[in-house]
Amino acid sequence: MKKRLFSLALASVMVLSLAGCGGSKGAATETKAETTEAAADTAKAEGASEETESEAASEAAAESAGGTLIVGFDQDFPPMGFMGDDGEYTGFDLELAQEVAKRLGLEYKAQPIAWDSKDMELEAGNIDCIWNGFTMTGREDDYTWSEPYMANTQVFVVAKDSGIASQADLAGKIVECQVDSSAEAALKEVPDLTATFKELLTTADYNSAFMDLEQGAVDAIAMDVIVAGYQIQQRNADFIILEDSLSAEEYGVGFKKGSTQLRDKVQATLEEMAADGTLKSISEKWFGEDVTTIGK
């Protein structure tokens, strides 16, 4: 009898044990799934964090290892950046960039680029920044920017004897601007005005635009006032700038989105140059006056 009772008790314990094992296996499976999911989430978060840290580390390593500040610029944009008579690249912006590189202990390299390919060059890492009369207005969220260092306006340049005295006189005329320029962007903001033009053309650079104006192929050029004044002076031509401007804007140095470390170093150096009079000196060399805005 006792043996039978023991057997029944043992059978009951085994049933309970099997039930317990089944429950433990299910719980273990569920716990394992939860653990795996949590681990995946953690790995994903760590991966994102590591990616951000990696980008910052790459930027710092590039500055440290490369030791070069590669400045992207339009070589046909005097006086900001162009090729001088000696075959060397020069200009107001390039002199600023060269001085900044010197103070940061970096090798300076001026890299000419096609203006409509500037974003591709920056994203590919072929250049470290765009520094060449680069308008911030309308592009505020597209780059990591320095603080503005110069004010500018978009204007129209016409022949003095053209009979064009205001924007209203551009009706029925051929107007030209540089492709992918701030002038082109500004013109898109005034469709009522551009609708009166006979034609709106674009060209690769402003040297070509001035040749077109000199030859009478176009009636007006829309462009930066800083560059317009310099071009008129250098060409000693009978061109005038219309008094009613197209838009007001500011120049800044544009870096790849997220390149804050290099931007901060360049910005601090520009502020140092403003404080010791270097910005003023370089500006007076190119424009006859101090047109910079940092520290003012």
Where are these regions (language model features)?
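Bacterial lipoprotein signal-peptidase II cleavage site
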Residues: 18-33, 40-48
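Extracytoplasmic small-molecule ligand-binding "clamshell" domains
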Residues: 61-133, 276
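Periplasmic-binding protein-like
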Residues: 75, 151-158, 225, 229, ...
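Bilobed "Venus flytrap"/periplasmic-binding protein-like clamshell domains
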Residues: 75-78, 89-102, 134, 155-207, ...
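Short helix-initiation/N-cap motifs at beta->coil->alpha
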Residues: 94, 109-121, 200-215, 249
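Extended ligand-binding regions for polar small-molecule ligands
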Residues: 94-103, 161-164, 173-174, 179-182, ...
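Acidic, polar ligand-binding/catalytic clefts
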Residues: 98, 102, 107-169, 240
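A ligand-binding cleft/hinge motif common to bilobed small-molecule-binding domains
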Residues: 117, 133-142, 186-189, 214-215, ...
